Amino acid sequence: HVEIFFDPQTHTDRGIKFDTVINGIYKALKKAEKEFGLSFKIIMCFLRHLDEELGFKILEQASLHKDKIFGVGLDSSEQGNPPSKFEKLFKKAEEKNFVTVAHAGEEGPPEYIWEALNLLNVKRVDHGVQCLNDDKLVKKLRDSQIPLTVCPLSNVKLQVFKKLEEHNLKKMLNEKLMVMVNSDDPAYFGGYLNQNLIETQAALNLSKEEVKTLLVNSFKSSFLNEEKKSKW
């Protein structure tokens, strides 16, 4: 099972039609489903360095492909672009029955995670590693078991941590947070899921039980329905 993000504004801004972007992605995923049994969900992200108003135009186009697009997210440059900038847009997305997620607390402060939870009503926080700098937030995340999609190789590439050995994933596990390992953008950040797991396990000396917990958490945190989750 895979839940992939795509940024349509990267392509529509250079003249490629929204329909062309989503139909190409969807066609490839359907082919993988048929050939490899790979189930999927598609999440469309808004680029946070752009104006919220531009997001409404993209959302309208996404609404025409609701049969393909499961949810909406928020990515790109985090610093100076808080989730609150997109509160109205995410409310509109929820009205259109899109599930909401958002990148928060990777390079940005814990306050961005609070905003993602309280203003964007996200069902999952992407990254979220800065949460350990806020005890109240840690308690909130522990009690609610809101998933955190941690991307270790990405964090190092962006210098959130200078090296993988300094990553706080093990501390997040010790806090009983609903964390898992993800790949972010493999082409940019140097590895798909397996590579992230292998390098992180070695760097942090994770036990077999800790690796198992990360994998189990990923299934729990997926947007698969309960029937399909139970098969795993």
Where do the PLM segments sit?
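Short HxH-centered metal-ligating active-site micro-motif
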Residues: 103
